[in-house]
Structure formats: C-alpha cells, structure tokens
Amino acid sequence: SDLVGLLTSEDSATRQHHMSVRSILIHVTEVPMLGTLVRLYRGIQELRNQVIEDWTVNSRDWTMPGFRAIAVHRLGTWLANRRSGVVKSGLLAVYRVLYRYVRNHYGIEIPLTVTIGRRLWLVHQHGIVFHWKAEIGDDCLIRHGATIGAGYGGQKTLHKGPKLGQRVEVGPGAVIFAGVKIGDDAVIGPNAVVMSDVPAGARVFAEAPRVIHLPTAHQAARKK
C-alpha cells in the first residue's frame, strides 16, 4: 500500500507539473509580442518558399536578372503587407533602391502594385514593363521586350491592368494592352499586339511579314 501511495503521489505531482507547464504556454501564446514574432516567422517562411520556387524556374541561377527582379518584387510586396514600424520603413527604403537598380540596370520594371503568382519565369532581360495594376497567374513565362499593359483609350482603360491566367507564355516584343484578359495556357507570339481578350488555350501571332522584291541596280539601270 505504501508503494501504491508513493506511485500515486508521483503521478499526481507529474500531472500538476504538466498542467502548470501547459498553463504557462497558454499564457505565453497570448502575449502580443510572441504572436507578432510567430506571424513574422510564418511570413518569412512564405517569402522564402516563393523565392526558392522563382529561383528554380529561372535556371537555378541567382545571378539571372529575371530572378533578381522577381525577388526584389517579392520583398517589396512582403514588406508592404507588414505592419508599420522603423524596421519596415528602413527595409522599404532598401527595396526602393533595389527596385530602381533593377529597372535602370536590367530594364525590368515591375511596380510594387503588380500582382504576381508563383513561379514566374522572366527569360532574358531588358524592355520588360508591367502595368501598375497587372495581374499575373502562376507558372507564366515572359520574354524580353514584352509590355504587359500598354495604355490606350482614355483614363478608364489606362487604370485597368491586364490579367494573365495561369501558364501563359508571352513572346519577345509582344504588347498586351491595358484591360485585356488572357486565358489559361494561352500563347502570345513574338511582336503580337493584343488589344482584345484572348480565350484559354488560344494562340496569338502577328501577321507574317511580306516579302517585297525591289529591283536590283542592274534592273534599274536597264529601265533607264
């Protein structure tokens, strides 16, 4: 009976200890500062995951201008969604410097207000411009010289950003006008000018160039 009493008292003490620890943890999680740190950690993890995905599709090369442009944009949008404070203000200042560097040095202009899905692939650099309200879906591919959201048709249209669905490919030199919607899996060919909505899975190509035969110098001399 003494042994049973000893074991019972130990179990009771253990239970009380666990209950006290659980109570402490509950109170700790209610501390605002800890909640902020947890949210910050989760936000950093999500940012990290997005950047790793972008790095993977952009040739797994951190020196690629396209990857750097996207990474800077990810940082900016992540900071914009954080609560205000001295740290946020300082990091936003760093973001603005990086944004201008990417725009001026690589020729890739992605305003902070652009919405970009996961795993965007920017092939090559220079001349890639996004409308400030553009929306880009997951797994899209955009090549050099593309303009996503050229303005025309007055103020109403100018303030409507184009929307690209998922897995859309945009060829070099293509122009997609403001307010245009591109469906999933569509392909916009090189130098195509898109002024109206494109259904999912469609292919848009510019007209084939005409071959013009000019008279040779010998033929021109004979005509004289």
Roles of regions detected by a PLM:
Residues Y106, P111-L112, G117-R118, V123-W132, ...:
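Left-handed beta-helix
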Residues D2-D11, H18-Y106, A217-K224:
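Terminal amphipathic alpha-helical/low-complexity segments used for targeting or macromolecular assembly
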